[in-house]
Design a protein with these regions (language model features):
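Long, hydrophobic N-terminal alpha-helical segment
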Residues: 1-37
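Short glycine-/aliphatic-rich beta-strand segments at the starts of folded cytosolic domains
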Residues: 7-14, 94, 116-120
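Beta-strand elements of well-folded, non-transmembrane domains
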Residues: 13-17, 32, 60-62, 100-102, ...
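Short amphipathic alpha-helices in soluble, non-transmembrane regions
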Residues: 24-27, 67-74, 134-135
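Acidic, Ser/Thr- and Gly-enriched intrinsically disordered low-complexity segments
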Residues: 31, 53, 64-72
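Short, charge-patterned binding micro-sites
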Residues: 38-63
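Mid-chain, well-packed structural core segment of small domains
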Residues: 69-104
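Glycine-rich, aromatic-bearing surface loops/beta-hairpins
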Residues: 96-166
Length: 166
């Protein structure tokens, strides 16, 4: 991907008192480059329980490519593309929620747990232009990861074997 049409990407997850904070951080790291720092803020919930907010902001192009590459493994990329009018707000921010438990296992799918907010480059900075830029990017990602035959994405071939087995 030669250019990245985002100004930055924010990722955030909550580690509740019943969860292992390290596992939540590991789930968040599924989407982050190795050198990304995770910010930690400890809060107290309404009933006095501990809630830790783990977040990271990626602002450099290589880091954003890493995040996008991880998101390209989403099974529901076509669904996200179809819902872009609802997922991009008037401030040109694209919102996704990915499954925290699946991310901990190294899988990428839509669901609760990790919020992804990407500020889409759009000139003029209007929602329709941002939707179109996000659509082009996600379509390109989907096309480049859609054949399922590259060992890098850990996918399987039609017969269920991995590319290394073929």
């Amino acid at each position: 991907m030669p250019t990245v049409p985002f100004h930055y990407v924010d990722l955030r997850a909550f580690a509740y008192a019943t969860e292992d904070e390290k596992r939540v951080a590991d789930a968040l790291r599924t989407f982050l480059p190795d050198d990304a720092e995770i910010d930690r803020v400890e809060n107290v919930g309404h009933h006095g329980d501990r809630i830790v907010v783990l977040s990271a902001r990626i602002e450099n192009a290589d880091g954003m490519r890493h995040v996008l590459d991880a998101l390209a493994d989403l099974d529901d990329v076509e669904r996200v593309i179809d819902e872009l009018d609802d997922r991009v707000d008037d401030n040109c921010a694209l919102f996704l929620r990915v499954d925290k438990q699946a991310a901990f296992r190294g899988d990428v799918r839509l669901g609760p747990g990790i919020t992804v907010r990407a500020k889409v480059e759009a000139y003029p900075a209007k929602q329709p232009a941002a939707v179109e830029n996000a659509r082009e990017t996600l379509t390109r990602l989907s096309d480049s990861h859609g054949d399922g035959s590259t060992p890098e994405n850990g996918s399987t071939l039609e017969n269920g074997s991995t590319p290394e087995d073929a």
